[in-house]
Design a protein with these regions (language model features):
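Low-complexity, acidic/polar, glycine-enriched regions of mature
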Residues: 25-206
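N-terminal signal peptide c-region/cleavage motif recognized by signal peptidases
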Residues: 20-22
């Protein structure tokens, strides 16, 4: 084969495997699918109800190995100016300076610092959230739902569900304390596409 002696065949094959090993091992790079990723939040409204609002990820990246979470890391920007409360007037009110202050801080930013693995599908993501120009440490319990090739074979996707409880006062939002709750419950449904297929122009439909 290729005119090489048998011993050199083995040496050549071993060298090829060693060259491929770094490509096959370790955490892979992902980008968040901003279409299929959503952030839902809820806050008490004067004791009457807990209305919901919707936010979207503007951009973000993830480094992740489903088998070894030690090198996992992520950063993402959340579009605050696009908040959706289901009503244009309510959207504008939430964006005012007393609450989200979208004019001065149109994005929130999260950067992870470490991942605490609990089992094969559950963990806690620790990091720093910058909201309204104020940075605070937060922890998000999360579930790894699935990491696999999609049914259409177009992408390798990692999907997560996470939750958080935020005290808005820690981020300088203290207005309307008599009618709006202090604690905000947050749910995140995230899908991230592995970068090795990001060059594809094909898009999956829901």
């Amino acid at each position: 084969m290729f005119g090489l002696p048998p011993t050199r065949h083995l040496a050549w094959f071993a060298a090829a495997l060693l060259a491929l090993a770094p490509l096959q091992a370790g955490a892979a790079s992902y980008r968040y699918d901003v279409v299929h990723s959503q952030i839902l939040f809820s806050i008490d409204h004067d004791g009457y109800s807990h209305p919901f609002g919707l936010l979207h990820i503007a951009r973000g990246w993830l480094r992740f190995d489903p088998h070894d979470w030690s090198g996992a890391a992520t950063e993402l920007d959340i579009d605050l100016a696009g908040v959706d409360m289901g009503d244009a007037g309510w959207n504008a009110a939430v964006c005012k300076r007393a609450l989200l202050d979208c004019a001065n801080h149109p994005y929130a930013h999260f950067a992870s610092t470490r991942v605490e693995r609990q089992d094969d599908h559950h963990g806690v993501l620790h990091g720093e959230l910058t909201l309204r120009g104020i940075t605070q440490e937060v922890s998000l319990p999360f579930t790894l739902n699935r990491a696999a090739m999609t049914i259409y074979g177009l992408h390798t996707v990692a999907g997560f569900s996470a939750t958080a409880m935020l005290d808005r006062r820690r981020f300088g939002s203290t207005a309307f304390s008599g009618s709006i709750g202090q604690h905000v419950t947050v749910w995140l449904e995230l899908e991230a596409i592995r970068d090795e297929t990001s060059h594809s122009t094909s898009r999956e439909q829901p």
